[in-house]
A protein has these predicted regions:
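Signature of N-terminal electron-transfer/Fe-S-associated modules in redox systems
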Residues: 1-167
Length: 168
């Protein structure tokens, strides 16, 4: 449980029509066992205590199943670990003295609402419509009567494991 000191470069933007930019914060004495979102909570507590506005970021379950915590960390969706959501990323994956750049998705369909929060409405509509399948395929056959190869079942499992974060 070592202490960690980081420099954070965080995208700040007041609203969808306002210009945004990176603002730098130093944060110290972080527990390496805390999650990335807990680190942002600590930063926000420090900002509020000093009279500054907290960083707006989206989250819901904090269990890696909802996809609301999506952000880009050091140029990668969700951060340095593949297959790990932002809320499941722990500070032990960073080194003391690191500079961590945090920004919202950079996609035209996801306009920034404030700081790290984006408008996910277009993506949510796709998910509500059943994903990317837009062809009427008729009624479903009996799933137990059709042999499925391992490579196809692996792909299907990957699709079923989607949490709707929008990183794809």
């Amino acid at each position: 449980m070592a202490d960690l000191n980081l420099t954070l470069k965080i995208w700040r933007q007041d609203g969808p029509t306002e210009p945004g930019g990176f603002k730098t914060y130093d944060i110290s004495d972080l527990n390496t066992h805390m999650s990335f979102l807990e680190m942002l909570d600590v930063l926000n507590e420090n900002l509020v205590n000093s009279g500054d506005e907290p960083v707006a970021f989206d989250h819901d379950c904090r269990e890696g199943i909802c996809g609301m915590c999506s952000m880009v960390i050091n140029g990668r969706p969700h951060g340095p670990l593949e297959g790990t959501t932002t809320c499941q990323l722990h500070m032990r994956h960073f080194n003391d003295g690191d500079t961590v750049t945090i920004e919202p998705w950079r996609a035209k369909p996801f306009p920034v609402l404030k700081d790290l929060i984006v408008d996910r409405t277009p993506f949510d509509r796709i998910i509500q419509a059943g994903g990317f399948v837009s062809v009427n395929t008729g009624s479903a056959p009996d799933g137990n009567a059709i042999p499925i190869g391992k490579d196809i079942s692996d792909d299907a499992f990957d699709a079923a494991a989607c949490i709707g974060c929008g990183a794809c």
